């Protein structure tokens, strides 16, 4: 095989690896999680648990969108939607109930589980579960000036 052909094959393999990496990391993160959290058994309200932010028009996260955020300065400046913040809290609470892992695995599995929750639960289920787990109270205590986050 000629050198040019080998170079093109190398480029194609490299690009395919880069394109597939977020999805593979997502699947790896999900395999590190024992079970999946269950949504709360409540009547859906459709309102964010911690704010009055409406839940219409939210697009679920996916691994590629999550990675792309790190390269878009405008997105990095925007506030994270409440539904994603609540999904992260639900994922974190679920992982706290499992045997401890090292930090890299914990971050990978919490990110993967957050993505999974936004894809498989409705925004109302996320809000109701966050309300049931009392995340609003915990979140607001950390935001209060002079609260636990102050050093």
What positions do the PLM features span?
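Juxtamembrane regions of bacterial inner-membrane/periplasmic proteins
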Residues: 2-151
């Amino acid at each position: 095989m000629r050198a040019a052909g080998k170079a093109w094959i190398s480029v194609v393999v490299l690009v395919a690896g880069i394109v597939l990496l977020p999805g593979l990391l997502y699947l790896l993160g999900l395999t590190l999680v024992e079970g999946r959290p269950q949504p709360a058994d409540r009547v859906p309200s459709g309102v964010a648990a911690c704010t009055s932010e409406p839940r219409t028009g939210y697009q679920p996260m996916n691994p590629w969108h999550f990675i792309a955020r790190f390269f878009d300065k405008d997105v990095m400046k925007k506030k994270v939607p409440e539904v994603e913040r609540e999904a992260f809290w639900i994922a974190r609470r679920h992982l706290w109930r499992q045997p401890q892992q090292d930090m890299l695995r914990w971050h990978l599995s919490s990110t993967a589980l957050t993505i999974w929750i936004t894809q498989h639960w409705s925004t109302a289920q996320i809000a109701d579960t966050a309300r049931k787990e009392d995340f609003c109270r915990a979140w607001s205590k950390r935001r209060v000036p002079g609260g636990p986050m102050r050093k």
